[in-house]
Amino acid sequence: STEKTPDGKAVHKRILPLNKEDEYCYYLELLGAAPSMEVFVNQEKIGDHTGSYTLYRVDVTDQIVNGDNELDIVCDSEVPCLDASLIVVGKHHFSLDHFGDAGLTVIPQEISTSSASIRITAHAKNLPEDAMISYTVLTTTGTMLANKSVPVSAPEYICHLTNPCLWNGKTSPKLYVVVAGLIVNGATEDQIVLPFGLRNLSMESNGSVLVNGLCVPEKDLIRTLESDPFVYDDMDEDGSFACVELKELCDIAADEEDCRNLLTEYVLQNAYHPSILCWKLPEDHADFAALLRELDSTRP
């Protein structure tokens, strides 16, 4: 249900029945709401977030109870919330607190038709020193192309592929899949599955974007800023091209630090999508270009 406060804010309310078990951790995930929101569980404020377009997670393990739980999301407008989910994970799990991303960073490097390098890094914390992370790279039909296990203390894996199939828009929207497993005492306790694509991006002096050396017509480039990550999933599979306009993120930020945080969240949450060809900043925020290059060096 939705109620309205005297100062014009909207309160989205829900009763969440739960069979709480002590061996699990519980996170609330919100795909997006108004420019700012506050989250209450059983009338206790547990977090707040600025940014309509970025996913937000908060640990609610200590606040929820066995039985009915009251969830209130207070927004500064009546814009409907996108999906809210309760994520249940074991005590040992990939990070759900790393800027709202998947807990896994996939950065293609040195891409050509003959070879490709992909830097893959999982994010985890509070794990035993002997914990391991296993990485497996597959085709979408399940053929294994590479695999390796690394210690959690050195989680980066540089994967090399020969003769890769490039993601080439609607001509060939070829995707790969990386599966990361968290291994503790010989058992896989958590797993992440993330699709990704391989393509070369560059930009000409006139502003035209090239994908694998071919110019993308302006009419084929969708200018967007999405809250729901499933939109980009569909574009990856369909072979559509997106130019992500970041102006609205900059406009809703309270200050420079808030703007940096919003941009970091959005880029890290969506950088693995091959359909996103470029990030576009407004001219009055061009000083954040260095931040975008630091977060994502693969796009022009």
List the predicted regions and their residue ranges.
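Secreted/periplasmic carbohydrate-active enzymes, especially glycoside hydrolases
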Residues: 1-244, 257-299
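Active-site clefts of carbohydrate-active enzymes
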Residues: 249-254
